[in-house]
């Protein structure tokens, strides 16, 4: 018996070690292939800014949560500022997702070889779609971890999970408001259903302790770094809510093809829990309060939330990582059928085939970086900029056939910036420039993108944005604006904001515009 137990334990250690290596390495590999400037460098620069004393909401306008950027600053602090430590951040979270999936499945007594298979396949599809730290992936991981925690709280009756759940939801929400807010609603709803039959003082205590600790940490950070509450309210709540009004339109029309058929493999992967949930409720509605059905409802709710979020986001398709996860739960509950081996084989094959398909179609071709139709072999080692970008394979959709030309243009811009000792603000999607030059870019926005990140004229909260930008120019004594094209979401930051007689525009080369500020009535009003 001892020998058998020892063998199983050693086997488990082997699978866990292999899972860590695979989940970390595969993301690390893809993080170095290709660049989408507007997305690839935003967290790179924000993490560097925080490390050097510039803080979100206070020093730069952001509707993205600060958690991602704070974690990146920590990675830079301990591992140095480089693309390797940047990629290691997202690779670590890919590994965390893989391990938590593995241990959650193991709690259902799924054989460890199957826990390993499903967790590995999920990690292959999770973070490598982008490779580098990205809000949608981080919030998805925090959200999935909160779902796992509630599933385990229901299954194991351990109170510690009730403490963990609000902490994970808090981290998720301050990574990105949605879908974290939707998951919070789902979890509160399922928790209430669970507590109707399983009310315990300990559960309430641990849950409130998690909520209290999260709120205390948030308020402490806000006061310590002197971040105005009004800025947080406007940037992270009010303006995004105004965007939500237009994003809701993206859900229309409500069509079977968009909501179901397009994501059919995800539905099929979860088909066993869906079937059992419907069957049990049909027999007796009050079966809904049974633990097993609450877990099914959690999984179905997660599916609906992720599909809704995918339809409302402007970013690339990424939710196919759910297929191996949901297939694993269908595998677990296949034992309720006589021909369970047939179902098990089906869900294993579905997971393998879908992983290969989506990996080849989206990940390997760097689809989310808009590089699908490009020859990635034309990429250039970005170490020509700096050793900080060593081994990054530089190629973008802006210069698909001549990355060397893009690099040459950017190197010329860097030289122009070096020569200018005036206080400057950089407006660019290539936000690595200030990091390499070890200067403050004095950027007023985490990402320069009208409407999606900050309001346009005539939109709600435009005056808030205008005041924020002009106050920053005055406070930081900015003399000149360096605008580096191409920009995905901006042309001229002053357009519709101040009159043309407040600045001179000098076109230095094909990608660089230098705007020198002049004395004018609008700028004087901020002095």
For each feature predicted by the language model, list its residue ranges.
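Membrane-interface alpha helices of multi-pass inner-membrane proteins
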Residues: 161-179, 183-188, 300-311
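Short hydrophobic alpha-helices at membrane interfaces in multi-pass membrane enzymes
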Residues: 149-171, 200-208, 292-300
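Short acidic/glycine- and proline-prone juxtamembrane loop motifs at membrane-interface regions
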Residues: 129-139
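Extracytoplasmic catalytic/substrate-binding loops of multi-pass membrane glycan-assembly enzymes
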Residues: 31-46, 56-71, 81-84, 225, ...
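Membrane-interface transmembrane helices that cradle and orient dolichyl/undecaprenyl
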Residues: 106-109, 146-163, 275-289, 334
């Amino acid at each position: 018996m001892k020998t058998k137990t020892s063998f199983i334990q050693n086997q488990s250690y082997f699978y866990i070690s292999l899972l860590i290596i695979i989940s970390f390495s595969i993301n690390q590999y893809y993080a170095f292939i290709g660049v989408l400037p507007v997305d690839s460098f935003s967290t790179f620069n924000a993490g560097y800014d925080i490390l050097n004393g510039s803080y979100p909401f206070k020093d730069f306008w952001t509707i993205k949560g600060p958690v991602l950027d704070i974690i990146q600053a920590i990675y830079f602090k301990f591992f140095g500022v480089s693309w390797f430590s940047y990629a290691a951040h997202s690779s670590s979270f890919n590994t965390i997702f893989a391990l938590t999936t593995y241990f959650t499945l193991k709690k259902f007594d799924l054989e460890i070889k199957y826990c390993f298979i499903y967790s590995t396949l999920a990690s292959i599809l999770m973070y490598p779609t982008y490779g580098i730290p990205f809000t949608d992936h981080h919030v998805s991981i925090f959200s999935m971890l909160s779902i796992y925690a509630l599933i385990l709280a229901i299954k194991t009756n351990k109170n510690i999970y009730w403490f963990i759940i609000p902490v994970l939801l808090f981290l998720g929400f301050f990574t990105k408001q949605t879908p974290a807010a939707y998951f919070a609603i789902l979890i509160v709803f399922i928790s209430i259903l669970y507590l109707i039959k399983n009310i315990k003082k300990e559960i309430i205590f641990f849950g409130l302790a998690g909520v209290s600790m999260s709120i205390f940490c948030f308020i402490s950070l806000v006061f310590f770094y002197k971040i105005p509450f009004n800025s947080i309210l406007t940037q992270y709540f009010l303006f995004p809510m105004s965007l939500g009004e237009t994003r809701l339109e993206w859900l229309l029309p409500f069509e079977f093809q968009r909501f179901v058929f397009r994501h059919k493999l995800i539905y099929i992967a979860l088909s066993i829990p869906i079937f059992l949930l419907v069957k049990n409720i049909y027999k007796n509605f009050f079966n809904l309060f049974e633990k097993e059905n609450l877990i099914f409802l959690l999984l179905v709710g997660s599916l609906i939330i992720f599909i809704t979020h995918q339809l409302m986001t402007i970013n690339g398709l990424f939710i196919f990582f759910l297929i191996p996860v949901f297939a694993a739960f269908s595998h677990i509950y296949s034992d309720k059928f006589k021909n369970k081996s047939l179902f098990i084989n089906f869900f294993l094959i579905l997971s393998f085939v879908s992983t290969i398909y989506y990996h080849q179609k989206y990940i390997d071709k760097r689809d989310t970086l808009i590089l699908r139709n490009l020859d990635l072999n034309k990429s250039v080692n970005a170490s020509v900029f700096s050793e900080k970008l060593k081994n990054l394979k530089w190629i973008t959709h802006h210069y698909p056939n001549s990355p060397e030309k893009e690099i040459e243009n950017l190197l010329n811009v860097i030289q122009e910036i070096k020569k200018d000792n005036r206080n400057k603000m950089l407006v660019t999607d290539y936000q690595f420039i200030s990091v390499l030059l070890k200067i403050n870019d004095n950027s007023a926005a985490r990402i320069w993108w009208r409407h999606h990140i900050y309001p346009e004229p005539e939109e709600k909260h435009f005056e808030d944005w205008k005041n924020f930008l002009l106050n920053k120019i005055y406070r930081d004594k900015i003399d000149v604006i360096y605008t580096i094209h191409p920009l995905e979401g901006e042309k001229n930051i002053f357009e519709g904001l101040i009159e043309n007689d407040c600045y001179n525009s000098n076109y230095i080369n094909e990608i660089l515009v230098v705007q020198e500020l002049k004395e004018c009535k609008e700028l004087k009003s901020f002095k």
